[in-house]
């Protein structure tokens, strides 16, 4: 009987768990502390530091079903999604991993056993590839597994040799392929027809056994490791006896749901496949804290959403539709990934808001694009058209390319990139794969942090740095870095500023200006007050006053984070944090500005928890245990297997290594001083605590009292009094404007006496005074109506600015153009202008030349009338 996709996923995890592998949950789609990745795109991403040897875990075998996104950056499958059988923006990667435990024999044996015994794939339908020089893998497949030699293909290209980068861990691969049969076109891997659909790769086994050096040398790793990956959608298609991933159960159900929502009956349209794919990536990205924006990961999400909306529109969707598919997705995948149900309301709202915003410009943008395509003489859409659609209507270039491709056209990508110029800071900027892993700093030194219990302690200098080099001595007055065997100084981490203070010796010591992590060592940066040597004993003393202020702000940050989730929703996730002595700053994911009421509600909730005076409790526990207990793990943070959990009553529980108050009451007072947006989908709150908060409130109270005194009212009535004054001012401004218009009308009537004639044509050129520049337009319209036929040029000087306006009745525009006339005068007063033949305006910056310029009009007109 055919297995469902969910059953295949579970069977894989259970199989390897039975083989002693630790089941590890899928990591976030936002890579943790990895600048080389835009999104998690493989199962091994979360284990990279384990493979590099910079991280230790309690297990040496692991298995996972990893959520992956490939759209943007190096792995960009977006333009092919929906048009091929196996391209997706979101997919699941099944994997088993060995960290210096088993190697090729067991990895190959496990893979073969799972495919042929658990999934019961026919052995004669499988063939494998090995790296051309990997005789060991070839022999295992042939001698141990029993695969005929003719079904083991040696591949010499990079397809069968994997590396993490230009340097670092690498090794040969062995790929397992499934043969769909002779009735499907295509050849085996390595043949000219290998791109056909007959032979489909289903599992890649990577044998990490070398460490590539910068000079190209490959040294054997002391503990070879295994990294494997099998696409869940691909293996499901084979087990369910279909040839396209879009025909498996999950996609068919999503496609049917899409068709029902947009109102179509046929399930064959490729746009249905696009929408079904995109709802998966968009929903999971939002659940992992990514919000639509104009840069980085948020821009990739926006591109995917807008591509889905365009395809829904193409299908005939009426109104917003995309967000309605979240329910169907939760039905399909909510059991495996509970976050879909937990954050369903937030995902739906974010998608709905984004779709509504884009829908306002989609129709107009499509008209512009279709007009451009209809007028196109060649086969390439110009880059400036692509840019206009992006800049004005929010059309990502790949969306325009999508439409063009449907009409057999392409876009001028180079021209688009040129038009974007420095405006374009998109997802590709966040993806940098040129990393030399051998040059990443490693240190055998380790400092013991004792700062939770003490603010001073005796320690020994274990290493000194001067100008980036390790030294034995540091001279008095020299700036450098000191490493201690143990230290009470907190090293900057998790947004909390590093401690300052002094390392005291009999001769003087060292002034610590900042503290940071250097591998596992605590690095004290500053200046030597006296000569220091490795091995010296020091008294490490933290600046206690500053540390205390930081504690207040850090604990308040935890309370505020919990309050934001309570008031705004569980989608709120930390996007950045700064905890200093004088303030705290907190960036978080949210799709709209907070209302004044919401800001006050958060502030009140935090102060209620401060008044409750909860004791702060810390506890060390396993990471999974902490998550199960409800501890909040922050996106972008990397945690050890054992973590420190900081709790404040039942209100807040977070994983945190920072320093905190003993009771929430120690914070004293919490005051939000600003809430603003720093990027699309990211808000920022700045706040103060303790005496700083009190001083802020006192200053505001003083200012309000001063304002009330000026307004001659009490503090409680100041707001009402300001509103009254604003209304009075508006009334007076209207009266003044009315009077100025009356003056202008009167001046216009007086100007009729200044009209001259040139060759029988009425001409008025005049320097008017005493009116607003905005009245010139009305004045010239009235004058044109009164004279019937003629040419008028009016100038006005206001301070150091000149305003000019020219009017020509339509019967004379074949002789005199208003734009040419006003530009002629403007050039003489340091400006320029233009407009229609019958009406044009200009400005200038040389009022001292205005009279001379106006006097020159008659001679200029003599030549034209």
From Swiss-Prot:
Catalytic reactions of this protein: tRNA(Ala) + L-alanine + ATP = L-alanyl-tRNA(Ala) + AMP + diphosphate
Enzyme Commission number(s): 6.1.1.7
Residues noted as binding Zn(2+) in the record, renumbered to the chain: 554, 558, 656, 660
Cellular component, GO annotation: cytosol
GO BP, sorted A to Z: alanyl-tRNA aminoacylation; negative regulation of DNA-templated transcription
Localisation per UniProt entry: Cytoplasm
CDD domains (alphabetical): AlaRS_core
Keywords, in A-Z order: Aminoacyl-tRNA synthetase, ATP-binding, Cytoplasm, Ligase, Metal-binding, Nucleotide-binding, Protein biosynthesis, RNA-binding, tRNA-binding, Zinc
Annotated TM spans: none
SUPFAM superfamilies: Class II aaRS and biotin synthetases, Putative anticodon-binding domain of alanyl-tRNA synthetase (AlaRS), ThrRS/AlaRS common domain, Translation proteins
Cofactor note: Binds 1 zinc ion per subunit.
Xref: PROSITE patterns: AA_TRNA_LIGASE_II_ALA (PS50860)
Family stated for the protein in its record: Belongs to the class-II aminoacyl-tRNA synthetase family.
Function: Catalyzes the attachment of alanine to tRNA(Ala) in a two-step reaction: alanine is first activated by ATP to form Ala-AMP and then transferred to the acceptor end of tRNA(Ala). Also edits incorrectly charged Ser-tRNA(Ala) and Gly-tRNA(Ala) via its editing domain.
Domain notes: Consists of three domains; the N-terminal catalytic domain, the editing domain and the C-terminal C-Ala domain. The editing domain removes incorrectly charged amino acids, while the C-Ala domain, along with tRNA(Ala), serves as a bridge to cooperatively bring together the editing and aminoacylation centers thus stimulating deacylation of misacylated tRNAs.
Entry protein name: Alanine--tRNA ligase
